[in-house]
Amino acid sequence: MSRTLIKGISTLVSNDPRHDGTPYGVVNDAALIVDDEKIFWSGALADAPKDQHESVIDLGGVAVIPGFVDSHTHLVFAGDRSHEFRARMLGENYTAGGIRTTVAATRAASEATLLRKAEKLVREALLSGTTTIETKSGYGLTFEDEMRSLDIARQVADEVTFLGAHVFPEEFENEHAAYVQLI
């Protein structure tokens, strides 16, 4: 047993309705007991089980909320679509290339470049409170480039999803059935 009492939580959002009868499960002046990396107990500090922990961490009065879950990400890509976003915000027609612009940049990028960018995005997500990410391919659009994207994604994520038909690639613009057969 390696349990730690975490106290100094001004507000805990537990998502456990047993705490306050709401879906949020808000507890004021709260504490957690963590067993290795899993929550063993949560509730009001005054109700914390005694002698159930070996160490104590005092957070100094912060709020604690569950980690965010991002259920739709593409971590492996190259390029930048800010010009497309700007055009849309200005009410211009969508002619910026969109996904296909990103596909071209991703195909041209090295594995090392794609991996560095994916690692950076994972770090930024974690620092912003996202603790669970589902990531998918979708910016290769050839069998080889999709497999390359999935291999890179597996280096930064436990679960990855194949999205080979994000859009039809330019080289299959008029041959949709052939592309579906390829994928």
Question: Residue spans of the language-model regions?
Answer:
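N-terminal metal-binding scaffold of metallo-dependent hydrolase/deaminase domains
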Residues: 1-50
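Metal-associated gating/positioning segment near the N- to mid-region
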Residues: 48, 59-117
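Metal-coordinating catalytic core of metallo-dependent amide/deamination hydrolases
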Residues: 100-117, 133-183
